[in-house]
UniProtKB/Swiss-Prot annotation:
GO molecular function: 4 iron, 4 sulfur cluster binding; metal ion binding; rRNA (adenine(2503)-C2-)-methyltransferase activity; rRNA binding; tRNA (adenine(37)-C2)-methyltransferase activity; tRNA binding
Annotated positions binding [4Fe-4S] cluster: 128, 132, 135
The protein's Enzyme Commission number: 2.1.1.192
GO CC annotations on file: cytoplasm
Cofactor(s) named in the record: [4Fe-4S] cluster
Principal localisation: cytoplasm
Organism: Corynebacterium glutamicum (strain ATCC 13032 / DSM 20300 / JCM 1318 / BCRC 11384 / CCUG 27702 / LMG 3730 / NBRC 12168 / NCIMB 10025 / NRRL B-2784 / 534)
UniProt protein name: Probable dual-specificity RNA methyltransferase RlmN
Additional facts recorded: Reaction proceeds by a ping-pong mechanism involving intermediate methylation of a conserved cysteine residue.
CDD domains named in the record: Radical_SAM
UniProt gene name: rlmN
Similarity-based family: Belongs to the radical SAM superfamily. RlmN family.
Catalytic reactions on record: adenosine(2503) in 23S rRNA + 2 reduced [2Fe-2S]-[ferredoxin] + 2 S-adenosyl-L-methionine = 2-methyladenosine(2503) in 23S rRNA + 5'-deoxyadenosine + L-methionine + 2 oxidized [2Fe-2S]-[ferredoxin] + S-adenosyl-L-homocysteine; adenosine(37) in tRNA + 2 reduced [2Fe-2S]-[ferredoxin] + 2 S-adenosyl-L-methionine = 2-methyladenosine(37) in tRNA + 5'-deoxyadenosine + L-methionine + 2 oxidized [2Fe-2S]-[ferredoxin] + S-adenosyl-L-homocysteine
This protein's record includes keyword DNA-binding: no
Superkingdom of this protein's organism: Bacteria
Length: 366
């Protein structure tokens, strides 16, 4: 029997990347410009290039003094990530990018194009410390937290890709590598930059941003108090503590009732419906009684402010589990809905290139 991966809340103390423009608040940015001999008004110019025009190279910012561009680049725009590999599938509508960071750490992001929108699945950590046994990322362990700049620049890169195609990046989901609420301050700062209008941010609606969590109950409550209107997605995967202690090890610290209570607090504070993520695993969590229990618990805890997103389990190397058959999915959905809770099956994209939920592993040789 394989040794269980340990649960890790605190990221290893490893060197963070060089300071980037996106890491700094306006006061720190102005101070940095002052040290370069540049006046305060240059901040707006640089911000409009980065967030509005999606440019990250000051050498192309022609409204800056020519002699200062290299200095601005060196001080505020270090190269945070370089693409190692880009793979596409689903008729080129899904694109997974493997990035190498300054210290050799790897991470992945996934851009999904739909007829009516485009969604970027971004990472908040390199690896993940939550140790969920059915998730490739969780089984790989946690390397380190990402910086604000490393999170934000994933968005800028994807937005630039969409712009080059004549489109626009419309949705962001923090469902890539890592537990977003375990890198709380940086994720919240990144969300604010993603959602603020130019020149302070990319101008993506807060309602078009989803922050996922395995159920760090205190952090869910803290996020509610930020008074943002992002969607909260809770990776529940089973309604009973006995199984969830195994499937989602963090449940040993914050059990189902506590997680749902925190989710209710978030729904009340934000006015938003909470999304419940449920990876359906054959003969593990797909039983009729679990569907009934799920519907009952969610209806009691969240009333009309909840929606279940059923995810057919995506295959991962060496996994002993596989997806429940379609007939089982359909019956599970029917039973949850019968308890008064909306439930749909997620349109899974990117399976063929290991870009779907639970498949991101950032392997350089893959």
């Amino acid at each position: 029997m394989a040794t269980p991966v340990p649960l890790v809340f605190n990221a290893p103390k490893r060197g963070m990347p060089p300071t980037h423009f996106a890491d700094l608040n306006d006061e720190a940015r102005i101070e940095a410009l002052k040290e370069l001999g540049l006046p305060k008004f240059r901040l707006n110019q640089i911000a409009r290039h980065y967030y509005g025009r999606l440019e990250a190279d000051p050498l192309t910012m022609t409204d800056l003094p020519e002699g200062a561009r290299q200095e601005v680049k060196d001080a505020l725009f270090p190269t945070l990530m370089s693409p190692l590999r880009v793979v596409e599938t689903d008729d080129d509508t899904t694109q997974k990018t493997l990035w190498k960071l300054h210290d050799g750490t790897l991470l992945e992001s996934v851009l999904m194009r739909y007829s009516d929108r485009s969604t970027l699945c971004i990472s908040s950590q390199a690896g993940c410390g939550m140790a969920c046994p059915f998730c490739a990322t969780g089984q790989g362990g946690l390397d380190r937290n990402l910086s604000i700049g490393e999170i934000v620049d994933q968005v800028r890169n994807a937005a630039a890709t969409m712009q080059s195609e004549g489109g626009r990046l419309s949705n962001i989901v923090f469902m890539g590598m890592g537990e977003p609420l375990a890198n709380y301050k940086r994720v919240v700062s990144a969300v604010r930059q993603i959602t603020q209008p130019s020149p302070a941010g990319f101008g993506i609606s807060q309602r078009s941003v989803t922050v996922s969590t395995v159920g760090l109950a205190p952090a869910i409550r803290k996020l509610a108090d930020e008074e943002m209107s992002v969607t909260l997605a809770v990776s529940l995967h089973t309604p009973d503590d006995e199984l969830r202690d195994t499937l989602v090890p963090v449940n040993n610290r914050w059990p189902v009732a506590e997680v749902l209570d925190a989710a209710r607090y978030y729904a009340d504070k934000s006015g938003r419906r909470v999304s419940i993520e449920y990876a359906l695993i054959r003969d593990v969590n797909d039983q009729d009684w679990r569907a009934d229990m799920l519907g009952e618990k969610l209806h009691k805890a969240l009333g009309s402010r909840v929606h279940v997103n059923l995810i057919p389990l995506n295959p991962t190397p060496g996994s002993k589990w596989d997806a429940a058959p379609k007939a089982r999915q359909d019956e599970f959905v029917r039973r949850v809905i019968a308890k008064g809770v909306p439930c749909t099956v997620r349109d899974t994209k990117g399976q063929e290139i290991a870009a779907a939920c639970g498949q991101l592993a950032a392997e350089e040789s893959a």
